[in-house]
Amino acid sequence: MWKLIKGLNHVGVAVSNLDEALKTFKTTLGLEPCYVKEVRDQKIRVASFKVGESTLELFEPTDPSSTVAGFLAKRGEGMHHIALAVDDIRATLDAAQKAGATVIDREPRVGAEGQLIAFLHPKSTRGTLIELCQE
């Protein structure tokens, strides 16, 4: 399956207050977001930063019933997921399932940047939530 992974797409960090986090990342690290927008179907507001060849996403829940709100309640702020770039998300999902991974999204959906995404359950990946992003 490793041949299906192209590289790192981004790292996602869950925050309780995106506006405060934006201030922190600007004053502490000098980072300015490329965009800030709401992703309604995921019930989040997200800010994306280009950091060299990589991307960092900060996101807050917009609904207390969202999975991100649940994550924050259980674990607090911090790294939420690692996103890996793939050419063919469906082939990667099929290979992951055949290898025994539990997929969260049986069908890919559209992510914050308009590309197809799907998640692998952290119980299948040694405690790390993996997002697959078709580039």
Features from the language model and the residues they span:
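Short glycine/proline-centered loop/turn elements that form peptide/ligand docking sites
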Residues: 20, 38-42
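Short, solvent-exposed interaction modules
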Residues: 70-99
